[in-house]
Amino acid sequence: MQKKFDEIRIEDLEVFANHGVFPEENTLGQKFVVSAVLFTDTRMAGKTDDLTASIHYGEVSAFITEFLQKNTYQLLERAAEELAEALLLEWDRIEKISIEIKKPWAPVRLPLKTVSVKIERGWHTAYIALGSNIGDSKMYLDNAVKALNELPTSKVEVVSEYLVTPPYGVTDQPDFLNGCLKLRTLLYPYELLAELNRIEKEAGRERIIHWGPRTLDLDIIFYDDLVLEEADLCIPHVEMHKRKFVLEPLGEIAPYKRHPISGKSVCEMLVELNEKEK
């Protein structure tokens, strides 16, 4: 069940800025009207009457104004996307944000009052499995954790201990070093997959033998409670419940995380797998 957040609302903030497709819009400028909903937890501020326990909407309004005035975009879509990301990165207390940017009297030569773009963006929690059985496996895993933590829109929150595990599938190969991590990210699933593939490639990963030896293997196990089934990406990972080398380190950092389809927790899946292997 998703957590319900409180809301801090900023409505119809007027900003004179220079966004648009036409050159005149970029040079002469025009009025934009911005509304924002900041999804957060106001409980502590409500109990203590302490502004530092909340989000200062005056500072947020000033940030929005400055951001839209110092940057120039052709599309409202781009302006909204960049603004939402900037706000989420600037204030840790904002878990999710809704942004609407209105453009009154847009130059379309028709009698309209306004056009607008409204988006909702927020933080997501992903669990990533790590594995290596070629070369300095610990170095490869450590470097992968570091690379993920250095992504501007992601933060590694917890990393499991690394475990030495026997190979899965193709057994005629060296033992693996495996682990799992919890990632807080603004990336969407396919964006995250692209980053994982990039990190694997930089580690010299070659996809020659299915389930074969590799310098680095990174898999998305969970992404919030998303269920996604595509040819090139399935979430939750379809084999996770069969893999002790995933469930053991994952159980260390998220034992009660539940599978969105089966409803079973990670520790329950691990117990069942151990029973089957007896």
Show the residue positions of the predicted features.
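N-terminal, polar/charged subdomain of small-to-medium soluble alpha/beta proteins
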Residues: 1-128, 132
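Short connector loops at helix/strand junctions that flank enzyme active sites
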Residues: 29-33, 92-94, 112, 174-178, ...
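Flexible, gly/pro- and Lys/Arg-enriched active-site loops
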Residues: 41-46, 123, 168-175, 187, ...
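Short, surface-exposed acidic-centric catalytic microdomains
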Residues: 43-58, 143, 148-188
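Hydrophobic C-terminal alpha-helix "anchor/cap" residues
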Residues: 83, 87-88, 148-149, 196
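A short coil-to-beta-strand element that immediately follows conserved catalytic motifs
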Residues: 94-98, 154-160, 213
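Short loop/turn motifs enriched for small/polar and acidic residues
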Residues: 100-104, 162-164, 221-223
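Extended accessory regions or peripheral subdomains of proteins
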Residues: 125-145
